[in-house]
C-alpha cells in the first residue's frame, strides 16, 4: 500500500508519495489554502492529491506549520537556568517560542504572557526536590489568566518542572478547568537537560488542543491526519539521517520567513563526561531565526550580515551591495517574488548564503557567556533545505553550503570533513513522520537524501 506524507506549510502544501518499501514515487507542492480566513486548508490538499495521482486507499501522515505553526510561551524560575532550558526544549519540539518569562509572575508579567498569544504554555521551574514556590505561584497565576479563554477553551499548560511539586501544580491549574499535560522535569538537576518527555507533551498538546482550533478547516479529517508540528517532524528526520551515517548531521533550512538550523551531535571527550554548563546542551537541537528570511525578512538578513561583518555598509560596502539591497527590498515588498534570470538568481543565492551563515553562527554560539559553543567540528553531513537551494544548480548550492562549512569567524572549529548536499525532494519531514511507527521505512526514505 502506498503512503502520502504531507506538510501543510505556511505558503505551500508539500507532499511525497511513497511505496511500501520507502521508494519515492512522486513529490509535489500546491499553494496552501485556508490560511487567510477564506476557503479550507484541505482544498489545497485535494489539489495536491490530484497532482500526485494518489490512490484512494493510500494512508496519510501529515505535519503542519500553517496558520502560524505552534506558538509557545515559556514560564520558568530563573532566566538563565530553567527558563533557558524550557526555551531550548520548546524549539526542539517544533515550537515558535514567542515569549519567555522568568521568576514569580507579577500582574504585568502575566499580562505579557497573555499578550504573546501562545497556543501552549510550557511551565517549568526548579530542579527535582529543589525550590517549588515559584512553580506553584506561577501555576496559580496561570490558572486564573485568561489566555485563549477560560476552562476547556483556555490555552493548555504543559507542566515540566520540579516533579515533587507537579501534582500540586496540576491541581492548581485543574481548579479552573484549564487543560494540562504532565511531563518530566526539563532540568531534573543542574547540568542535565531532559527534553523528550516535555517534547512529547508539547506534541500532545498541539494535536489535542491546538491544530483543530486554528480555523484552517471545518473538516475534522484535517486534525485527524496531522501528527506533529512541521519542525518537530523535520528534527525527527534529521535524527533518522544521523542514525544512518553514524556521524554528526547539521541541516540548514533557508525559508521565506525564517532560517532554521538543526543539528544532531554525538558528544565526545569532555563534552560527554563533564557538566560544564548550568543548562546542558541539547545534542539533538533546533534553532529558528525569525529575522532571517529571503522574502518577508530579506532586509533583516542584510542588517544581520552587517552586524556579523559579513557585509559592508556605507563607504565600506563592496561592489554589488546596492544591487543586493535593491533585490532584498523587492523581495520584502513582494513575498511571492521569484528570480527570472541569472542575475536575480545570483542575488537570491547571495541572500541565502548570508542568511545561512548568520543562522549557523547563532546556532553554534553559546546562549550565555559562561557556556561553551556548540561543537560542530565533527559534523560529517551538511544538508541544505528550502526552495532557493532545491531550485539552484550545483554551483549555486555550493555558493551557499561551502560558505557555511568554511566559516570560522564565530571562534569555533569548523567541520573537518563534511560533505554537503541538498534535500532535493524535501523528504526529511516524511522520514520524521514515520520514525516512531515505521523506523525501517523512515530509514529507507532518509537514505534517498544521501548520495
State where each predicted segment sits.
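Phosphate/pyrophosphate-binding loops at sites that engage ATP/ADP/AMP, CoA/4′-phosphopantetheine
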Residues: 49-59, 117, 146-151, 241-242, ...
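Gly/Thr-rich phosphate-binding beta-strand-loop-beta motif of the actin/hexokinase/Hsp70
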Residues: 1-21, 110-125, 130, 241-268
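N-terminal phosphate-binding loop and adjacent alpha-helix
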Residues: 28-53, 104, 128-129, 296, ...
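Active-site phosphate-binding/coordination module
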Residues: 74-95, 108, 114
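Short beta-strand-loop/turn "lid" adjacent to the catalytic site in phosphate-handling enzymes
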Residues: 56-83, 389-392
